[in-house]
Amino acid sequence: MKSLSMLIKPASSNCNLRCTYCFYYDICNNREIKSFGMMKLNLLETIVKRAFNEAEQNCTFAFQGGEPTLVGIDFYREFINFVKKYNTRNINVFYSIQTNGTTINEDWAKFFKENNFLVGISLDGTKEIHDKYRLDANKKGSFNKIMTNIKILNRYKVEYNILTVVNKNTSRHIDKIYKFFKKQDFRFLQFIPCLDPINDPRESHPYSLNPKDYETFLNKLFDLWFKDFLDGRFVSIRYFDDLLSILLGNNPKSCCMNGFCSCEFVIESDGSVYPCDFYVLDEYKIGYIEEKTFSELFNSNVTKNFIDSSLNHDVKCKNCNWYPLCRSGCRRNKEPNFPNGTNDNIFCESFKSFFEKNISKLTYVAKTLAYRQH
């Protein structure tokens, strides 16, 4: 494999927070074993060894959870030792970790900096907005702790971005959220739509994001972002970055904008492997990393069926003027009906409205960026 990326869950579904809308909590409650416990070091070594046996040019290790820091910092120190041991061909290696930010201290910050980790911090906005759903086991908010720890990251000059879940509440306060992020000088942002539990009817929870709210959110966020762009302050917002990449003839970074699913090689703490973080379910298990190579896992029938099923887009979808930008969106946003029944993305009308309103401005930004690069 020229490039190999994997998503490792060293603490399985274990987490020190109890976020109301957590999609992985829902996932683990829909499989036979909710938590596989903490990953053993011999399994971690196997993962690293297999990765460098197969990666030819680039290798990316992403850590998520649950809360991946719960496994302890020594686990990651050993991980770096394994990388040094097995990367005998000196291929390019990239590290990232997605954390709720509550456990970060000076040791973690120093480690991230020394080893060039890109850190994703989950933060939903101001204290009032964030603490509505991102609570600990005692139902207390996590905002204050996270903001304190972000200051530690800043002090060590750790590279990080902010990940915000767009739920009903955050979608209606994007002006306040964006203003707050701007005040904190957060320049790299991701906004991901909140997912309803996989077997529940759409929009059946207080936090559920409906298409109209998402449409309003996208339009307001774009207006704020575009104004900053005109004022000479470019903020990286993952979704807008991907749209600009497509307009400039490049590939988006987000898998949901490719028009088909890929295999993310999600590795749970027991070594079981799955094609996607949204489908770490028993029926989507590809196999075990201790028993199969990455190539064998990729060529399995489960992986093939998962990818092939994502290629079935409605004719009306393919004929839509905005298909080249939308590309049908994330498969998970077509549940619970996908792959049988309707194939509509729940946010189809949201995207249509957004593109119709903002395509000329998006094109202007793309052309401006292209001009600056020459």
UniProtKB/Swiss-Prot annotation:
Binding-site residues, [4Fe-4S] cluster 3: 317, 320, 326, 348
Known EC number: 1.8.98.7
Known catalytic reactions: L-cysteinyl-[sulfatase] + S-adenosyl-L-methionine + H2O = 3-oxo-L-alanyl-[sulfatase] + hydrogen sulfide + 5'-deoxyadenosine + L-methionine + 2 H(+)
Residues at which S-adenosyl-L-methionine binds: 21, 66, 122, 134, 195
Record keywords: 4Fe-4S, Iron, Iron-sulfur, Metal-binding, Oxidoreductase, S-adenosyl-L-methionine
Residues forming the catalytic site: 277
Cofactor note: Binds 3 [4Fe-4S] clusters. The first cluster is coordinated with 3 cysteines and an exchangeable S-adenosyl-L-methionine.
Radical SAM core domain: residues covered: 1-227
Positions that bind [4Fe-4S] cluster 1: 15, 19, 22
Superkingdom in the source lineage: Bacteria
Pathway stated in the Swiss-Prot or TrEMBL entry: Protein modification; sulfatase oxidation
Positions that bind [4Fe-4S] cluster 2: 255, 261, 276, 330
Broad EC category: oxidoreductase
Cofactor: [4Fe-4S] cluster
Disulphide linkage map: none
GO molecular function, one term: metal ion binding
Function: Involved in 'Cys-type' sulfatase maturation under anaerobic conditions. Catalyzes the post-translational modification of cysteine into 3-oxoalanine (also known as C(alpha)-formylglycine (FGly)), by a free radical chemical mechanism initiated via the reductive cleavage of S-adenosyl-L-methionine (SAM).
PANTHER family hit by this protein: ANAEROBIC SULFATASE-MATURATING ENZYME HOMOLOG ASLB-RELATED (PTHR43273:SF3)
Family statement drawn from the similarity comment of this UniProt entry: Belongs to the radical SAM superfamily. Anaerobic sulfatase-maturating enzyme family.
This protein's name: Cysteine-type anaerobic sulfatase-maturating enzyme
Organism: Clostridium novyi (strain NT)
Lineage: Bacteria, Bacillati, Bacillota, Clostridia, Eubacteriales
